[in-house]
Amino acid sequence: MKPVTEMANLHTAVTWSPPQPPFLKINYDGAVFWDSNSAGLGAMVRDIMGGVLASLVDNIPPPQTVVDVETVVARKGIMLARDLNLSSTVLEGDSEIITRAIQAEEQSLASYGNLIEEIRLHADSFLNFRISHVKIKRNSVAHSLTRHARYVSGLVVWMEEVPSHILPALLTEAA
């Protein structure tokens, strides 16, 4: 049996981490549903206590690649934060490709390059902005939202709440 400290570290390694004040965190995720020829987008804005300010899901025609899907949802997440008039945000997703593309100083020539430029433009409108990459296990609520997108038609936004079946994942992360 592992010592308690190691077990605690294992638990910490797979849970959501809150942003540092004064930041709010936008977690996002995207997925392609090949069987239904659609893509799901999920994003959530949370505070330092894990409280939900807003969440969204969208079901769209699938872009060319999974990376394109992740870029579309990153853009939706940052636009949600902008629409909420947030001043300090962390944009966090599990696509290292997108994180690096947003952080890069040069223009992206990839199929999603225009969306990366738009994300950067929106990022400049915040007083404080950070971008963060996280393993999928630490992005489970956004991943659950993305899966829910399979069952919606178009964009759905919730203010200070999430779909009821997402609550168990949210509560597990808060534990």
Where do the PLM segments sit?
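Primary recognition of RNase H-like, Mg2+-dependent phosphodiesterase/nuclease domains
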Residues: 1-175
